[in-house]
Structures are given as structure tokens and as C-alpha cells.
């Protein structure tokens, strides 16, 4: 496999961290890109930074903010419930903005690829996590920046348990990444709530490995 310069859009969650470590394991020249968009989950940025430090991967961060509507975080939904509706936690425009910024940054540093942890075999029902969205975005980028970095989604058609299995082979453990929408402070430590959709999906993914 030819060595490439790969920029990974990296939140600190399981999917994007798996992409990051897989690209590194394949021998590519890898860098991590985080987007600080005024999110409530600064803990995810801390996890991403810690992962990059642990694996000696350069970390880039873009700071951007825009007006966001208040969102309700649903609790204790089953995986089956998540499959049949768009979560109230969906943030319109987020992936559209992230991929545009990521692609521009990838072009700026001379990367061959922008890798993303997009996963359409998911239960969130997010319209910007579908094969149609991904294919359409790739088409737009090819028109708007022909010859630019390729947008690659290595996990696109993998299930959550399959991603967890791959993550495990790369050395990741269940608590090495952060996905929770509602971090809690317990006994002076930041912990996942265990009730939001992200926590339930994370639990589902890793339980399947037992």
C-alpha cells in the first residue's frame, strides 16, 4: 500500500479514533483535525488530544461557531427506537460545515485524503450520516475542487459492533474514547451518563464483543 498523507476528522469518539489508528497502522503520514464549534462536550476534545499525545500524532484544531438551536437530549432509548426516528440531538449543518472545513484544511496541508468516521449502518437516523449524503458530498467536492484531497469514509458500511471489534484489534479499549452527550461529575471525575443515545450505542457496540 502506497504511503499517503492522511488528515482524519477526529472527535475523540470511537469511530473517528478507529479511523485515526487504522490509518497510522497502515503506515500513512497521519494528522488529527478537531473542530471546536462551541460544543458542550469539551471533554471529547480532551480525549482526542490525549489520544494524539499517546500515539504521537500531530493535532490540528479549527475554531468556529454559529447559532445553534437548543436541542433535547433523549434518554434511555433502545437501539430499536433510535433506528426509526431522527434524534432530537441532531445538529443541522454540523457535518456539512465539518467536511467543508476539513477538506479545505486537508488541501492546505497537502493531504491526499480527508478521512471521516461516518457510519451509515448506525441507529441515530441522522440524515448527514447516510450513503446518499456521503456520495453527494464527494460529488460536490470533485466539482468544486477537482484533484483535491479525496474524502474517504473507511467505516461507512460497518456496524457499531464491527467498528468496536476493529478498534479492539488496534489496541483501543471500551473507555479509551468518548461519545457521551451528557457528561456527569461523580466523585470529582468526569464520567459518561450511560443514558443518552451515544452511550447506549457505545454499550451496544462493546457488549457484542463479549
Curated annotation (Swiss-Prot):
Cell membrane found in the keyword field: no
InterPro entries named in the record: QueC, Rossmann-like_a/b/a_fold
GO biological process: queuosine biosynthetic process
Keywords: ATP-binding, Ligase, Metal-binding, Nucleotide-binding, Queuosine biosynthesis, Zinc
Enzyme class: ligase
Pathway annotation: Purine metabolism; 7-cyano-7-deazaguanine biosynthesis
The protein's required cofactors: Zn(2+)
Known EC number: 6.3.4.20
Organism domain of life: Bacteria
Cofactor: record remark: Binds 1 zinc ion per subunit.
Residues reported to bind Zn(2+): 180, 193, 196, 199
Summary of the function given for this chain in its UniProt record: Catalyzes the ATP-dependent conversion of 7-carboxy-7-deazaguanine (CDG) to 7-cyano-7-deazaguanine (preQ(0)).
Family of this protein: Belongs to the QueC family.
Protein name: 7-cyano-7-deazaguanine synthase 2
The species this protein was found in: Rhodopseudomonas palustris (strain HaA2)
